[in-house]
Every structure is written in C-alpha cells, then in structure tokens.
Amino acid sequence: MGSAGLIEIKRRIKSVESTRKITNAMGLVATSKLRKTRKELFINKKFFEETEKIIEKLASTISQDDDSIYFKSNKSKYKLYILVSSDTGLCGSYNNTVVSYLDSLVRDEKENIKVITVGSKGLSYVKRIGLDTIADYVDIPDIPTVKEVKIVFESALKMYKDGEVSEINVAYLDFVSPVKQEPKAEKLLPIEKITSVPEEFITEPNSEEVLNNALNIHLKGKFRNILLSAKCSEQSSRMTAMNGATQNANDILDNLNLKYNRIRQQIITQEISEIVGGAEAQK
C-alpha cells in the first residue's frame, strides 16, 4: 500500500473525527438535559408527596364507597396502557427495553389491551409486538409541563369514566440513577382504598368533592412524575450511547493513526533504500 493508501486512510480519519465531534456534542447536550430534568423531577416529587399526605387526611373523613370513579372499577374487559417512549432516536436500547417489558406484561391478554403511546418511537415498536394504538402523543418536551400531562391524562380518564377500560396503567423506564434505569408499570386507576387514622377538620363545600378534586390533581402530579422519570431515563440512555460511540470513534482513530504511521514509515524506509541503492549503483 503506497501513497494512495495513505490518502484513503486520511479520508477515513477525517470522517471518523467528524462523527466523533457529533457524538461528543450530543453526549454533552444529553448530560445537560439530564441535569435539568432531574432537578424538575426532584421538585415534582416533593409536590407529589405533599398531595399524597393531603389525600390521606381527606380520605380518613369519608367512606370510600363504590360511587367514587377513582376507587370504583367497571366491568369493561379492556385495560389501558400508556406507553412512554422517546420522540427521537440515538438513545441505545431505551425504547426496545420498555416495549419488551410491556409485551411481557400483556402477552397473554393482548386482545383485551388498548395502548396510548407517548413519543413517536413507541408507535412502530408497539406494532411489532402485535398491539394497536388508539391515540399517539408526540413532541413531548424534555421537561413535560402540566399542559401535556393534562391532555394525555384527561384523554385516558375519559375512557375510564365512559367504561371503555377498567384500568389505566403506565409502562415506562423508571430513572434510578444515571447508570441504572428499570422498566416499570404503575396503575393510575382505580386507586386502592386508602387507610389512614381519622382526623377531624372542616372541608368546604364537602369532603367528597374536595377529595375528588385533590385526587385529580394528585394523579396528574403522579403522571407528570412518571413522564419526568422516563425523560431522565431517555437522556441518561442517550448520554451513555453517545459516550460509548465517542469512545468507539477514539479507538478507531487510534487504529487508523497507527496504520497511517506504519504505512508512512514503510514508504519512507523504501524511499531511503532506493536512494541508498541508487547511490551505490553510481559508484
């Protein structure tokens, strides 16, 4: 391999260096987004925990009878799963992991499962496991707001109120740490009966109405918590994938540079040998 080989290797080196710049930049962006989303998740968890305390106190003042839509199930044979996926790719096995987990949950009852996807990537993945979606929500921001939460949750709640589904569940990748994310499913409705020590206090207009309003706010807070956790997992997966790609690019560059220097050394050695040989022939 001569100078033509060196030109080809230099071209490949430039190509890999260009790719490395992109993956490194994407890794840095994912790291920054993860930091911001984790901060928002921490704040929302505090809100979620406080509403939970309020609900426990309110629940102690009334009888959680079968008239409440939040505690009462219905006779529908269908269960609803909200699948939280990503809108963009380059996040490793993030989408495949959560969809495979959903598949394992519903494998024996797929004919009774309805799915709402959050994130454009979930739609194609869900079809691969033989499920159809009834609604798809895309372009969810990196930090989901109350607006997005309300749209998705109220759509699911309407199906539950109308008796179309007997359960509302959410399948997502729960954020444990930057190096650990676990697939998880949480049931939003119906809520299990709340047991707490009775307390005496006055509520206006009445305890039932206040509790129902509080439960609605609480469930939206819980759903936002899930979306934020899933977004953290997505950014963490993307950060890991991009860091891995950058390291692979570094390894390839090391090999290419070594190969380039070896060939260059061979060419120089050959040229020196030819010069020496020519000089010897002149004697």
Curated annotation (Swiss-Prot):
GO terms for biological process: proton motive force-driven plasma membrane ATP synthesis. One of its GO terms (molecular function) is ATP binding. GO terms for cellular component: plasma membrane; proton-transporting ATP synthase complex. Keywords: ATP synthesis, Cell membrane, CF(1), Hydrogen ion transport, Ion transport, Membrane, Transport. PROSITE patterns: ATPASE_GAMMA. It is a peripheral membrane protein. It is found in: Cell membrane. NCBIfam families: ATPsyn_F1gamma (TIGR01146). Produces ATP from ADP in the presence of a proton gradient across the membrane. The gamma chain is believed to be important in regulating ATPase activity and the flow of protons through the CF(0) complex. HAMAP family: ATP_synth_gamma_bact (MF_00815). PANTHER family: ATP SYNTHASE GAMMA CHAIN, ATP SYNTHASE SUBUNIT GAMMA, MITOCHONDRIAL. F-type ATPases have 2 components, CF(1) - the catalytic core - and CF(0) - the membrane proton channel. CF(1) has five subunits: alpha(3), beta(3), gamma(1), delta(1), epsilon(1). CF(0) has three main subunits: a, b and c. Belongs to the ATPase gamma chain family. This is ATP synthase gamma chain. It comes from Clostridium botulinum (strain Eklund 17B / Type B). The lineage of its organism: Bacteria, Bacillati, Bacillota, Clostridia, Eubacteriales.
